[in-house]
Amino acid sequence: MKKRVNTYLAIAITTYCNYQCFYCKKGGESISKEKETISFDDVKKIIANAYANGIANFRITGGEPTSVSYFCELIEYIMKFKDTKVRINTNGFRILEYIDVLTKYKEYIDIVFSVDNLSEYICGVHFPKYLSQNVIEITRALRKNKISVRYNIVVTKLNECEVRELVQKAIDELDVNVKLLDLNRFSEYLGYSNEVTGKEAYDLWQELFVPMSNFYDFLCQISTHSQAEWTTSLI
């Protein structure tokens, strides 16, 4: 197998999620809007075919992938292939149930944890993925077992006021990496209380969008890397 450099395959194994974040869309990262989970046999075929074509890096996402019954078996299956690596995108739901298999393959696995802010509510808007005590304990358990953890923070005008403090707490107190993400522009969002589509979705995006350039000075202050190393050319 000729390995493809810097190429990975993202697989949304389920559209089910235990959270309903206002900035997300139906199905999460899946292109499907139906409530469904890909069968384990189908996922194995996808992985085997991808590996045969030079892909050895896999990102497992959803929905919430840790809610899928075959999650543990999936990790074991991917690790059977030589030189594979796995990134798991999760909100932390049930992740500690799999601590043994994650620790077993910790050299080849990293966890991307969605954590958006310090407070559960900002301006009356619910943020399910906040830095709760439970999230802190899960993070510490993963790091205690030497498992790589990164927080993904989706920045909006609502939580922008807490992002800097969250970043510093994550790095200094919890020993995790952090990635700031701007708000994806979708044609639909789950919304604050009801789903919004079309022009309403665009209006919501405009209302909430924050350019990453707002954080460049802050990142320069706390990072030992140059701007070219921690950002793209897109502002």
Model-predicted segments: where are they?
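Hydrophobic positions in alpha-helices of CheY-like receiver
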Residues: 50, 74, 78, 102, ...
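Hydrophobic faces of well-ordered beta-strands that scaffold small-molecule active sites
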Residues: 7-11, 58-60, 86-88, 111-113, ...
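Radical SAM enzyme [4Fe-4S]-AdoMet core and its adjacent flexible, acidic
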Residues: 114-116, 120-235
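Short Fe-S-cluster ligation motifs
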Residues: 45-62
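Canonical radical SAM enzyme core domain
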Residues: 31-45, 65-107, 114-122, 127-134, ...
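Canonical Radical SAM [4Fe-4S] cluster-binding loop centered on the CxxxCxxC motif
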Residues: 2-41
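Conserved N-terminal glycine/acidic-rich loop preference
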Residues: 1-5, 22-23, 86-89, 142-147
